[in-house]
Amino acid sequence: MPLHKSAEKRLRQSDRKNARNRARKKELKVLVKNMQKLVDAGAPKPEVEVAYRSAVQKLDRLGVKNYIHANKASRKKSQLARILNEYGKAE
């Protein structure tokens, strides 16, 4: 446990930031999984495109605000785009 008042405050702050970061990353994982579930279930392409757009928006936002690395956001967007394009060709 922290011995100084400032260390206690830093602990509180880091706990809050950690919870916020985990929540944002969890939202992203849920959006990506939702898109993958739609693809696996054979949903209509417009539904998959809506899920793709929402996932890409979240990726962009988290990448710009440094919740995830910008290159990771770009890589994930590319992977999702590839899935979407292959899904369109499969039908």
UniProtKB/Swiss-Prot annotation:
InterPro entries: Ribosomal_bS20, Ribosomal_bS20_sf. One of its GO terms (biological process) is translation. The keyword RNA-binding applies. Binds directly to 16S ribosomal RNA. This is Small ribosomal subunit protein bS20. One of its GO terms (molecular function) is structural constituent of ribosome. Coiled coil: none annotated. Pfam families: Ribosomal_S20p (PF01649). Belongs to the bacterial ribosomal protein bS20 family. The lineage of its organism: Bacteria, Pseudomonadati, Chlorobiota, Chlorobiia, Chlorobiales. Residues 1-18 have a biased composition (Basic and acidic residues). Gene3D superfamilies: Ribosomal protein S20. Residues 1-25 are annotated as: Disordered. The keyword Methyltransferase does not apply. Keywords: Ribonucleoprotein, Ribosomal protein, RNA-binding, rRNA-binding. One of its GO terms (cellular component) is small ribosomal subunit.
